């Protein structure tokens, strides 16, 4: 997922570039047919012996290709730990042929994904200086193992120092793999306990054949700053007196600073950051076998989003098997917001994370000649600039008249197109460029190079002053730090939004966490900074924040299922910021945030540790959901590897009955009744009363309206009947359903849309 790179000149270009290693096979008639990597998915493994599983894969390939030699040369990965399958070089006709094998669930082409931070955890109530709370109850995540699938790691970073850590947990079965500029004995320690890299589905293990730049490392070491930032945000150690070029000065740490980190490099520097699905699945398979306690993946595909078990959505496949084995999987909600239907990683068994701002900002003061001071969004770090002010329409108009002046211009283009202003700036020797563009929460630090971004409102204010002033002037000062209540919390404009167009009954995203201007470890070479720490933004940054919290929750509640952990996060999340102020949603226009912006709300880790009740979900519940979603019974059988052919009940269950900690009804016409089940994880003898805030024009009836728990009754169900008073198609309206015993508030969001005319978009 997207990250904002701190240097003004470095713009990410996000695109789906499918770079395939190409070979050719001779087919009938002497023609050549291209081979490329395909993933053959076989579902749950039949053997606990990994070698037997791999042998079965080779036998299947041998029967297809005709020889052991061809099978051995064709296979790329054998998935043999968490589930069964393999990746191999096949022609399209060979892929079609093997797909007809009775043991094969699906054959899919190798597809490609994209990559999507000091005050963060204090803002969420996890100050290490406070002796009480989840952070200390969980012993800072001691011995929890966080698996990070990303672009690698910069192992020398102080965020991965192992000072004060005990021996590596005995349950750890993973490894550190040597490679270019990566010595496992030197670079791994009691903090960074695992480091693997995966490239076989993309290219051979040498740079000559790979087409990657010399700056990339053929090892777990990363060349561009993403994976290091993600890993240190989730579980980085304490590091004092750090900053990004003077911003965010303080002590930095991850969410679970005493957790162990295992890195799986699956993304590579090509034309863009390329992450191949065959490698991602292999990394997830290894992570399951290695013994990680959770997996965080800040990776996703460009729109359109894909179904839970779509042939191109292999992350969901791998996540299903991890969750079935008790390993929670977190993934980024994507950076294609703020439009509707842009959220990614929408499978109900994944924890999908949105991004918010913090109560911290580094605005740059712009003082006009009339003594009006505006605060620009770009954090400028450099000497004060004073000069005459002029306006131009485009870079082409930035003539020699701009020499020595501060130039104002407006743009509707992308960040990439703004690079043209940088080039012209130096050609004509202007002092600075102020670019007015649509509001954007991606921060780029302008360090010594005066490229200042403002929104249209501030741009118009500057233009009005300029247009009525004979000799307009401006002063640009170095950025200042703003912290606390005065800085509003917002869902970032880039954060992927619901509703979920593929599975509309599943609310996504699930929760939100800070993902804007996050300071964490980075790669000093590419960041142009000796400190090795950087500000980045994106759902890639918010996801490891929540991963750190899940690590703490796992330490306190090792017996909770992934669904219970997810429920605790959602039902205790807040729709206000830590100061009690409303959370806004940033976009073309600003509004109050709703469940399609942030799911249950902003995570509240201390409350999540004691949620009172949880909505649990079993593997069988997910199978019933797949039945309700009209998946083929053979697919469900293979995915879960049941001993007998899986049969969906008749009639098929309702998708509304999946025991999610939310209720989303996208097509309400007649009354519907659904069921939810809660498990008491609080005081044994508890009485919970109901509070309902119905969506506008919607009636909610709940039976019973009181839940009584005791030593014999720990699990209770309730029914919810939903009806509409609307007479025509409506938009989505939102509400909430809360159970409270006086000390706990267990809240789930409600999202309801009336559809009197189906398939008619008003």
UniProtKB/Swiss-Prot annotation:
Pfam families per the UniProt record, alphabetical: fn3_6, Inhibitor_I9, Peptidase_S8
Cellular component terms (Gene Ontology): extracellular region
Chief place where the protein resides: secreted
Leader sequence segment: 1-16
Listed InterPro entries: Peptidase_S8/S53_dom, Peptidase_S8/S53_dom_sf, Peptidase_S8_His-AS, Peptidase_S8_Ser-AS, Peptidase_S8_subtilisin-rel, Peptidases_S8_3, S8pro/Inhibitor_I9, S8pro/Inhibitor_I9_sf
Top-level EC class as recorded in UniProt: hydrolase
Catalytic-site annotation from UniProt: 150, 226, 540
KW NAD (keyword) present: no
Cellular localisation: Secreted
One biological process term in Gene Ontology: proteolysis
Entry keywords, A to Z: Autocatalytic cleavage, Glycoprotein, Hydrolase, Protease, Secreted, Serine protease, Signal, Zymogen
Domain Peptidase S8 per the UniProt entry, residue ranges: 120-609
Listed PROSITE patterns: SUBTILASE, SUBTILASE_HIS, SUBTILASE_SER
GO MF annotation list: serine-type endopeptidase activity
Residue ranges listed under propeptide: 17-116
All residue ranges annotated as the Inhibitor I9 domain in the record: 37-115
Glycosylation site residues: 206, 241, 371
Record-listed E.C. numbers: 3.4.21.-
Family: Belongs to the peptidase S8 family.
Protein name: Subtilisin-like protease SBT3.11
Gene name for this UniProt entry: SBT3.11
